């Protein structure tokens, strides 16, 4: 896919940018489902324009789990000359030895009756407040409280790790009989390894740190270097949450990211079969994400100076 201005700002989820195939793992081998059989995994080969992105998503999912959030299970596979990420489908249940069942899910666009084209807030899609209000409006009180907490924790992680593509279609609700739950994290990656200190001369495979930001604003701000503790307090006020408690919740996630990133990368690099280039990208990921998380932590603690342009 061509490197567009949107991609240079970290908006990677564009038509044709990422290929994927849903397949089935059965009896120790991969295969295509037959008839009504359910798939079990999603394989994603990443295009050459974004180096290391399969490993990026794999590390990001592990990072999410490491800081205490539910995240889809994944692994890195080599198929031919391609590096791909294999993600186990969380919307599947084992019925018996011969049968795998499906769990219905709706992403946040579907839950809000919006078309897929509205996944980015900047393009008319929902923001954090819209999603929180929808959850509180439609779920039982106890379930809504837990779901909102986990959704806000996911937003805190997205900020800390520079997950620019955390839009409304990348969060879902699992619906099983009378139970509703926020789906594990999926399709999450960090733009930080691709950051460059440029505004105009951004080459393919690079992301301008000055243009990059969250897919959903925190209060009025989306750029990473503009978000402060006050923005999280304002957001809390908008949705009827306690401002100080919300900041504490966000800070608790952000504080865990630097050490969790180092742990995740260390474990990855120790895996048998990891190539020098894979380890090199993982180290780049570690340095970049730790830096981003440190900046976010300084901001939430009031030690950083936001760079807001008029």
Can you describe what each PLM-predicted range is?
Residues 1-168, 172-310:
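Anionic ligand-binding catalytic core segments
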